[in-house]
Amino acid sequence: GKIKRYAKSSGTTNSKSKFIPITDECLQECHFKAGKDMLALYENNFPKSDLYNGKGLMLGGSLNKSSKEKNQEGDLSAILLNEFPFWVSYHRVPDLKTALMKEWDEKLNKIAHQAMNENITSLTGVPSWMLILLKRILALSGAKNISELWPNLELYMHGGVNFEPYKKQFKELIPSKKMNYLENYNASEGFIAVQDQSPSKGMLLMLDYGIFYEFLDMEKYKKGESDTINLKNVELDKK
């Protein structure tokens, strides 16, 4: 069938951004399936969680829509927000129109006003922008920290960048002892891995999302050999 969604890849140091086709199968059997697995893993690690007694604050990118071709292109996060099942809207802040806005300053203000009076139990988004949003919410609400504003907040799901440079600031903004952090590796090309055990920082490679993996033996690669290894022949604990 015809592809109607294209996620803008961040590219690499040596290449420009690419537009990755997102099929219906990719949405359902990779990204959405991964989201369900991620939450299931969290609940397994924290069985006393009250995550679903509140709402999730989701911060994503923007989306361009072509009325003629009915195509969508933009950040993967925006495509996912736009394609979530209808029932997700009952548990999500902000509303979809605000979530997909392009003008970031106005977008952050609107999200802040919508979120500060809600019972927020989880956060999702890139750390750099999430920090800006949380600080803006504190400025508007007058609360001394995020835990005072949202006492039931317990989870931040993050990915896309190294979290270590941001961790101290998050702990200062959210001093709650029950706060948990869950890392994932979700790329435009597919959902790769998720932090499956706490407090371990390692991420579990997800193998049943329709992604074909190839690997390199680093010792041989350093010698100029570039033969790939398929998943079946991977040796554990070997670089």
Question: What role is predicted for each listed range?
Answer:
Residues A40-F86:
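Conserved AMP-binding loop of ANL adenylate-forming enzymes
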Residues I20-P21, E69, K135:
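Short, solvent-exposed loop/turn and secondary-structure capping segments
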Residues G1-S9, E25, C30:
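General structural concept
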Residues G1, I79-K239:
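Active-site glycine/GP-rich loop and adjacent strand/helix microenvironment
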Residues Y6-I20:
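Conserved adenylation A10 loop of the ANL superfamily
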Residues I22-N45:
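Conserved structural elements of the adenylate-forming
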Residues S17-I20, A40-G54, T121, K178-L182:
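Short secondary-structure capping/junction motifs at helix and strand boundaries
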